[in-house]
Amino acid sequence: MARGLKKHLKRLNAPKHWMLDKLGGAFAPKPSSGPHKSRECLPLVLIIRNRLKYALTYREVISILMQRHIQVDGKVRTDKTYPAGFMDVVSIPKTNENFRLLYDTKGRFRLHSIKDEEAKFKLCKVRSIQFGQKGIPYLNTYDGRTIRYPDPLIKPNDTIKLDLEANKIVEFIKFDVGNVVMVTGGRNRGRVGVIKNREKHKGSFETIHIQDSTGHEFATRLGNVYTIGKGTKPWVSLPKGKGIKLTIIEEARKRLASQQAA
């Protein structure tokens, strides 16, 4: 009889966006319980060892974490399989480096280097707004936070700008037509564009039509859309490519041009 959680994860069953090679062993690090879903996160061990290359082995990662060198969203984390996810800020004070976890246009996690000023806040999508004991309002965000007494104008699917030091809402963005968004799920994950219109289907999913800066239009579900700025200006800096997905021909031309330049 099964008792409790699975403690292992086979390498072949790990999410594709972790980009683990098949011949690197039988197992992959199983993410701990935390603010992000296990299929939508990147464990700290993979960030330090596979992405930043600050460690060669699992044991080296443990010793780095136990020296309390790694912070996620301003808090020291010592759990080697802590699940960092979309919009999380990973800081290494010893090297004065800050990274924000974003998606590239192929749907893979990208550690985007940011300045100290930008590392002080993060954008959180509002999951729901409820009332607790004695009618105290509070909101839940997509990264598992609960914030009491929010602005009454904030509604589900809006995005809040959260000060990580004070844990307070600084500003918020309404989920409206004309605002810039990033897609966080589905085949268009990582693409950035402006909301053109919302299609409401009774008893089914709401469809959002988005147009990127090159004029290409695409559609996705409401749950996959994350507002990142007012108008066409995003509040966070974006990785190289600015969330514009190239066609296969455009990618091939770009590759040829870079090879000829080299």
Swiss-Prot record:
Give me the gene this protein comes from. Answer: RPS4D
* Family label: Belongs to the eukaryotic ribosomal protein eS4 family.
Determine the domain of life of the protein's source.
Eukaryota
GO cellular component annotations of the record: cytosolic ribosome; cytosolic small ribosomal subunit; nucleolus; plastid
Full protein name: Small ribosomal subunit protein eS4x
- SMART domains, from UniProt? KOW
Regions annotated as coiled coil: none
Per its UniProt record, what InterPro entries does this chain match? KOW, Rib_uL2_dom2, Ribosomal_eS4, Ribosomal_eS4_C, Ribosomal_eS4_central_region, Ribosomal_eS4_central_sf, Ribosomal_eS4_KOW, Ribosomal_eS4_N
- Record domain S4 RNA-binding: where: 42-104
Where does the UniProt annotation place the signal sequence?
Answer: none
Q: Its Gene Ontology biological processes?
A: translation
Question: Which Pfam family is one of those matched by this entry?
Answer: Ribosomal_S4e
Per the UniProt entry, the disulfide pairs are none
GO molecular function per UniProt? rRNA binding; structural constituent of ribosome
Tell me what organism the protein belongs to. Arabidopsis thaliana
Q: Where, per UniProt, does this protein localize?
A: Cytoplasm
Q: Which UniProt keywords apply?
A: Cytoplasm, Ribonucleoprotein, Ribosomal protein, RNA-binding, rRNA-binding
